[in-house]
UniProtKB/Swiss-Prot annotation:
Its EC number is 1.14.15.24. The gene is BHY. This is Beta-carotene 3-hydroxylase, chloroplastic. GO terms for molecular function: beta-carotene 3-hydroxylase activity; hydrolase activity; metal ion binding. A motif (Histidine box-1) lies at residues 177-182. It comes from Gentiana lutea (Yellow gentian). It is an enzyme of class 1 (oxidoreductase). GO terms for biological process: carotene metabolic process; xanthophyll biosynthetic process.
């Protein structure tokens, strides 16, 4: 029986042929067995392998090295470009910061000058109006008592109407603020709701408008005797007192147009200032329109919680 195997590899072939004894032969006899020595060559010789490896690895290593070098050079070029770009961005940012700082310094200097100008105007007007009011009250009653009679009814009417006029001005200002200033006179009042440029604004003309009837009432009451002139004198005095209080609380405390000193430490005035700040925020459709009774207006529309939050915010800002 003859069996033949053929195994083919990548680089070699294996041939094996076996001649065995026939199964019919019972007696032992020597018969030539012809076997061919199998040849197994799985890999090529070591020298060839090492030679092929060397020839293959050298170009590959060289190519990798060249690619890495090119890649490194590219990264260096990109990094250099990034450094140049970062330097330009840094210079541009420094210029912007310097320009912003210069603008801020100019703005602070302008604000300081405006506050000083308004402070001088407020002090002079307050001192002048207060001194004139005190002197006019003194001389008016001293002249009336020259005959030895004390006009009690006239004096009582004067002081009563002074208080009444001051309180009434709050309600007048509240109505006028909503019905006139935020309506037909908005073109003048609008300057008060925009950032102010300069120490004064167009809205300040309303102070002059309110001063005209006060001066007229004071003049008539000062130069005439009797109950009616005394009442007119008191009304003018009340309007004047309200105007001075309005200037210190509204212009000084709320809008910080000049320092007000210990007025800022009065708890109720802090509530008034916070309430008027909410008027400028339009959170309650402009409410409150009044000044000294502003917290009461907010209570009527359910804004007490927001008012307390605004008071706390202003307190933190003042402390910082």
């Amino acid at each position: 029986m003859e069996t033949q195997f053929l195994v083919s590899g990548r680089n070699s072939n294996i041939h094996c042929r076996i001649d065995s004894i026939s199964s019919s032969s019972l007696t032992p006899k020597s018969s030539p067995v012809s076997t061919s020595t199998p040849t197994l060559v799985v890999f090529p010789p070591f020298k060839l392998v090492s030679k092929s490896l060397r020839t293959r690895s050298k170009p590959r290593l060289t190519v990798c090295f060249v690619l890495e070098e090119k890649e490194l050079r590219g990264k260096l070029v990109v990094a250099s470009d990034d450094d140049d770009g970062a330097g330009e961005v840094r210079k541009q940012r420094e210029k912007e910061i310097s320009a912003s700082a210069e603008k801020l310094a100019q703005k602070l200097a302008r604000k300081k000058s405006e506050r000083f100008t308004y402070l001088v105007a407020a002090v002079m007007s307050s001192f002048g109006i207060t001194s004139m009011a005190v002197l006019s009250v003194y001389y008016r009653f001293s002249w009336q008592m020259e005959g030895g009679e004390i006009p009690l009814s006239e004096m009582f009417g004067t002081f009563a109407l002074s208080v009444g006029a001051a309180v009434g001005m709050e309600f007048w200002a509240r109505w006028a603020h909503e019905a006139l200033w935020h309506a037909s006179l908005w073109h003048m009042h609008e300057s008060h709701h925009k950032p102010r440029e300069g120490p004064f604004e167009l809205n300040d003309i309303f102070a002059i408008i309110n001063a005209v009837p006060a001066i007229a009432l004071l003049s008539y009451g000062f130069f005439h005797k009797g109950l009616i002139p005394g009442l007119c004198f008191g009304a003018g005095l009340g309007i004047t007192v309200f105007g001075m209080a309005y200037m210190f609380v509204h212009d000084g405390l709320v809008h910080k147009r000049f320092p007000v000193g210990p007025i800022a430490d009065v708890p109720y005035f802090r509530r008034v200032a916070a309430a008027h700040t909410l008027h400028h925020s339009d959170k309650f459709n402009g409410v409150p329109y009044g000044l000294f009774l502003g917290p009461k207006e907010l209570e009527e529309v359910g804004g007490l919680q927001v008012l307390e939050m605004e008071i706390n915010r202003r307190t933190k800002n003042n402390q910082s």
